[in-house]
């Protein structure tokens, strides 16, 4: 059985890691390369760096940060934010990223997914979906872009199926309702999408305790759990989470 993954998420704004609640109220959480290095040594399986202001401010993700990170960490890492072309993907992969995450740009031009997958391989192309529950229509989640600012009107489940068909190798699924709240992942949303696509789904948004992380895997059917506030604030360590999940008989790579 494929090992389930724990992935610290570092939201980057102006070269610093930040954390907020429901995509707003950002506060400083440290230097991205230093934090990435710390989590790598602490036993994380992968890392995700998301330049959350890159798309909104229309500037490209800092290649320098990727290069410095690749020299410092020993685990795979994904970079997203402001990537809107094959050249942009190529630049980040050449700088040392293992995968790139496409979000707003994939909605604007879905062919970027297939072109990226054809040129660099599906394993390099992650599509990030920021989803928010539709208050008027049951069992519907809307896809948001531009750092959660704009509702596209797209149905998140249908969009997930489309990005798989276009060649995405993985989906990074963030519940905007859960983001930073520590009230638990949106299990219903995660399971709906994990059941619809045969590629890994990373659950994101809402982890507040050990049980939440277990439920993302057992109930939500996710392949990985993204963690931010819980780790940045020192409430839990990766070791504590892994030891708990191993005791719960989940297939987790132990810390050596």
UniProtKB/Swiss-Prot annotation:
Pathway in which the depicted protein is active: Amino-acid biosynthesis; L-histidine biosynthesis; L-histidine from 5-phospho-alpha-D-ribose 1-diphosphate: step 5/9
GO terms assigned for molecular function: imidazoleglycerol-phosphate synthase activity; lyase activity
Listed EC numbers: 4.3.2.10
Keywords from the named record: Amino-acid biosynthesis, Cytoplasm, Histidine biosynthesis, Lyase
UniProt cross-references to Pfam families, sorted A to Z: His_biosynth (PF00977)
Enzyme class: lyase
Reactions catalysed according to its record: 5-[(5-phospho-1-deoxy-D-ribulos-1-ylimino)methylamino]-1-(5-phospho-beta-D-ribosyl)imidazole-4-carboxamide + L-glutamine = D-erythro-1-(imidazol-4-yl)glycerol 3-phosphate + 5-amino-1-(5-phospho-beta-D-ribosyl)imidazole-4-carboxamide + L-glutamate + H(+)
TM region positions: none
InterPro entries: Aldolase_TIM, His_biosynth, HisF, IGPS_HisA/HisF, RibuloseP-bd_barrel
One CC-aspect GO term: cytoplasm
Protein's GO biological process: L-histidine biosynthetic process
Active-site annotation: 11, 130
Subunit (UniProt): Heterodimer of HisH and HisF.
Physiological role: IGPS catalyzes the conversion of PRFAR and glutamine to IGP, AICAR and glutamate. The HisF subunit catalyzes the cyclization activity that produces IGP and AICAR from PRFAR using the ammonia provided by the HisH subunit.
Family: Belongs to the HisA/HisF family.
Listed name of the protein: Imidazole glycerol phosphate synthase subunit HisF
Species for this entry: Prochlorococcus marinus (strain NATL2A)
Annotated gene: hisF
